Amino acid sequence: GDDEIFEPWWGVGVAWDCDTPHTWGLAAPQVDSTNMGGFRYEHPIKTEADYERLAVPTFSYNPEKTERALSRMSDLLGDALPVRLTCQPPLAAMQAYYLEHLRGMEALVNDLAFRPELVHRAMAKLTEGILRATRAAEETGLLTANHHEPMSCSDPVNGQPADGRVRLHNLWTSVNSQEFQVISPAMQEEFLLSYQRPVLQQYGAVQYGCCEDLTQKIELIRRLPNLRVFVCSAWTDLDKVIERCGSSHTIMWRQAAAAVTLPDDLSAYQQHLNEGLRKLQGCHYQVVLRELETLKGHPDRLKEWARLGIELAERHA
């Protein structure tokens, strides 16, 4: 009953070699912390001096590894499903995610406030690495279109290439700023968006946002190059997003999973969804439910949710 898309083929991604033992030159080992699967990272940047150990990676296409992976999957699937090579850049404009992984959230926030020059140097290195990765992917000539995926389903971005060769401006990219949730708009512009922008301008279509509250940053995000989808999380003010975005961008209205999966029935949630879709009349929008951890004993809840969403969307079409 929903619109999850499954292609009639199995994709095998290109194999990349990286000239650093760890992507940014530093290992961030995972440390298990609970019997239920919880874990934490051992962040390798612990001092100011550690920032200088950040390395800018260079990626290269490995045809032998790629061919072996294709062959293995073809042998496994046989005639059941065709196998295709897929290729996307090995890094995206997720500088805040990469740096938090290396430094840790509390330390990163302190650095933004008291050691901003360190953050700027780190962001510059991360951006250089991302740009190298995107150029390397495009130069292989193997990039494959990604407009058929569930979160970025659209017509071909910037049309079908006349020569058949997909380039970055034919691709979607999806990025966010969750680690900057508590950072001011001005500091987000200075320390993140200014570094994301050179990467995003190479792509044909951009989706921005995830679970962060972007209410105070709507105008900043709207000015990003090639923005097509503004993600309005369950914590972002939908009214303000509609007011600023109107029909100029697609609004991806994400639902709070707990509101859908935990109650005994959907009656209270139905009021919320109905009111939101009423407000979204005249806009281009998507309603997305993700980040599910449990159905709390309601095995049919997702089917119920999909039916309800379709019914209310048709009512307010």
Write out the residue ranges for each language-model feature.
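Generic hydrophobic/packing signal
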Residues: 2, 16-18, 77
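Ser/Thr/Asn(+Pro)-rich, low-complexity disordered segments
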Residues: 1-10
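A gly/proline- and charged-residue-enriched helix-loop-helix capping module
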Residues: 33-71
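Active-site loop segments of alpha/beta catalytic cores
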Residues: 56-317
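Terminal, charged accessory segments of proteins
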Residues: 10-25
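Conserved oxyanion/phosphate-binding beta-strand-loop segments in alpha/beta enzyme cores
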Residues: 23-33, 90-94
